[in-house]
UniProtKB/Swiss-Prot annotation:
Gene: thiC
Transmembrane parts of this sequence: none
Annotated cofactor note: Binds 1 [4Fe-4S] cluster per subunit. The cluster is coordinated with 3 cysteines and an exchangeable S-adenosyl-L-methionine.
Pathway membership, UniProt: Cofactor biosynthesis; thiamine diphosphate biosynthesis
Taxonomic lineage of the native organism: Bacteria, Pseudomonadati, Pseudomonadota, Alphaproteobacteria, Hyphomicrobiales
Name of the protein in question: Phosphomethylpyrimidine synthase
Residues at which [4Fe-4S] cluster binds: 563, 566, 571
Keywords of the record: 4Fe-4S, Iron, Iron-sulfur, Lyase, Metal-binding, S-adenosyl-L-methionine, Thiamine biosynthesis, Zinc
């Protein structure tokens, strides 16, 4: 349902309430009984004969009926106490908000400011601040315990098939365990193979983990532009995206009210929020890349870190010496951040200040535990440009920068393409693992063909499923509006569902031990014609039921043993059920006709010819119909027995 909890404001309503036949539940880790780890339990029908199914849940408090949602106040901030209890931080006043933070917007167009103010925290001295630093020192944090419980989906007792699932998959060298422990989480973070993006100032965050030995995650992009959208719409899109399964959200706003938009999103977001700081820095210098300076950019990093942004995309790999490599490309430089830095480098004929000041960037981000998302500013924007020297030269530099960031105590993931045909995808994954020390890979698709404007959620979903299988840790969604316009909330949902499919398909292929439980539950519901369970076990129950109701809308149709595709007489699953019922009621002589001599189904001696003749006579006796009434079959079998 939609609610407007404070009618005195102009804040837009956001979507709340549980998904169909679902309820919010919480798991409690044995090692931290004070933690409440959210899950969604899908409630199956009484006739299912199996337990309800817990699934991973990204929706935050918005689907918990016991929580009163007021976007004007924001979400609760329990993580702030975790951070303070660990020590090594100080609370301070923070920088003042400046007019340029919101693009010098005039009063007529200024968005309402978020009224609740929280003094920011920052790290002090050499005490560990980041999850990477704690992990390297052998310390298991509450965040690590939290994500371990989340990854196991609160169902340790249901993972008896875990070893079989792992053996069935092809993980391409990933080390997915049968069960995730907090110690395993700590070890993966310490190795740099996983990150928990969790700024110490994002107290509303429900921690999650990104790494190839965990569930494949997806990101949804939102954000305004200079020509469209508002703060209200972006907050609504964020809540809508996480409802359908977005694990993280990036605010890519480039228009007015950037600071205010981001504050509203962060204070109401239970998932990590990422940004591309160069976008806001550009707005502060009238949109002219040539006017950018290190000082301006640094101030922007501090501004966003104090607000609580969990990861920054930083295009530090776009170096002056690589720009000429893009000259022969079909589509040149397609990354906004990459093109901004390329223009700055050429205008000043200097090395990028993101590269030359990288050490300082690390020191700044460490104080807040902002994770790096090292941007691929030279990613290919067409399949013709895939895997060229410009793309891979930048990737090699990102590998060098990763080692510097680790040495400084920062968490790191690496961004990837882009537009890559299917036969060139795996080399991207393999090269990234080699060059970047197995740091998590985070890709935009990739799009596998360039011929489908309006359907690029599909062209990219194909590539996303493949690279997720090969080891990519997080997939950035693409919506139907890609290359065409700013996505609305319908596009956001389509993009999220498409990428949930891709991520889940990758987990199945890798042999993730918990992945197939939901598939099997839905398959059983499908075979048993439990229509409501089919809808509710799916990623999008509303759409599934709407499609079914277009042709079979009555309640009686929800228990029918057919759908409108095949009708009552040609449903393969109905026929199979009839065959099973029929076989179960056969006498011994009849079974002899169905099974070869020596088959386990043949329990007494007898000639096959006699059995076949008997069954032929019975077929004629019952009307020579291929499709038989089950009750008549049972009566006939009783007469024969």
């Amino acid at each position: 349902m939609n609610i407007r909890s404070n009618p005195e404001t102009t804040r837009a309503a956001v979507t709340t309430g549980a998904l169909p036949s679902s309820k919010k539940i919480y798991a409690t880790p044995a090692s931290a009984p004070d933690l409440r780890v959210p899950l969604r339990e899908i409630i199956l029908s009484e006739g299912a004969g199996e337990p309800n199914l817990p699934v991973y849940d990204t929706s935050g408090p918005y689907t918990d009926p016991t929580v009163v949602i007021d976007v004007n106040k924001g979400l609760p901030r329990p993580r702030t106490e975790w951070v303070k209890q660990r020590g090594g931080v100080e609370q301070y006043e923070g920088r003042d908000i400046k007019p340029e933070d919101n693009g010098n917007v005039g009063a007529a167009h200024a968005a309402k400011a978020f009224t609740a103010h929280h003094q920011p925290l920052r790290g002090i001295s050499d005490a560990p601040i980041t999850q990477y630093e704690f992990a390297r020192r052998g310390i298991i944090t509450k965040e690590m315990i939290y994500v371990a419980e989340r990854e196991n989906l609160g169902r340790k007792q249901q993972l008896e098939r875990a070893e079989a699932a792992l053996a069935d998959g092809e993980s391409f060298g990933a080390a997915v365990p049968a069960f995730i422990t907090p110690e395993f989480v700590r070890d993966e973070i310490a190795r740099g193979r996983a990150i928990i993006p969790a700024n110490i100032n994002h107290g509303e965050l429900e921690p999650m983990i990104i790494g190839r030995n965990f569930l494949t995650k997806i990101n949804a992009n939102i954000g305004n532009s200079a020509v469209t959208s508002s703060v209200e719409e972006e907050v609504d899109k964020m809540v809508w995206a996480i409802r359908w399964g977005a694990d993280t959200v990036m605010d890519l706003s480039t228009g007015r009210n950037i600071h205010t938009t981001r504050e509203w999103i962060l204070r109401n977001s239970p998932v990590p929020i990422g940004t591309v700081p160069i976008y806001q820095a550009l707005e502060k210098c009238e949109g002219d890349p040539v006017k950018l300076t290190w000082e301006l950019y640094k101030d922007t990093l501090i501004e966003q870190a104090e607000q609580g942004v969990d990861y920054f995309t930083i295009h530090a790999g776009v170096r002056l010496q690589y720009i000429h490599l893009t000259a022969s490309r079909v589509t040149g430089i397609v990354s906004r951040g990459g093109s901004i830095m390329a223009k700055w480098c050429l205008a000043h004929h200097k090395e990028s200040f993101l590269y030359t000041h990288f050490d300082e960037i690390c020191d700044l981000m460490r104080k807040y535990d902002v994770s790096f998302s090292l941007g691929d500013g030279l990613r290919p924007g067409s399949i013709a440009d895939a895997n060229d020297r410009a793309q891979f030269a930048e990737l090699e530099t990102l590998g060098e920068l990763t080692k510097i960031a680790w040495a400084k105590g920062c968490q790191v993931m690496i961004e990837g393409p882009g537009h890559v045909p299917m036969h060139k995808i795996k080399i991207n994954m393999d090269k990234q693992l080699k060059e970047c020390g197995e740091a998590p890979f985070y890709t935009l698709g990739p799009l596998t063909t360039d011929i489908a404007p309006g359907y690029d959620h599909i062209t990219s979903g194909i590539g996303a499923a493949m690279i997720g299988w090969f080891g990519c840790a997080m997939l950035c969604y693409v919506t139907p509006k890609e290359h065409l316009g700013l996505p609305d909330r319908n596009d956001v949902k389509t993009g999220v569902i498409t990428y949930k499919i891709a991520a889940h398909a990758a987990d199945l292929a890798k042999g993730h031990p918990a992945a197939q439980l939901r598939d099997d539950a839905l398959s059983r519901a499908r075979f048993e014609f439990r229509w409501q369970d089919q809808f509710n076990l799916g990623l999008d129950p509303d759409t599934a039921q709407a499609f079914h109701d277009e042709t079979l809308p009555k309640d009686a149709h929800k228990v029918a043993h057919f759908c409108s595709m095949c009708g009552p007489k040609f449903c393969s699953m109905k026929i199979t059920q009839d065959v099973r019922d029929y076989a179960a009621g056969l006498g011994d002589n009849e079974k002899a006709a169905l099974y070869p001599v020596g088959h386990a189904g043949m329990t007494i001696s007898g000639t096959i010819e006699d059995g076949m003749a008997q069954m032929s006579a019975k077929f004629k006796e019952m009307g020579s119909s291929v499709y038989l009434d089950a009750d008549k079959v049972k009566e006939s079998n009783k007469a024969l027995s």
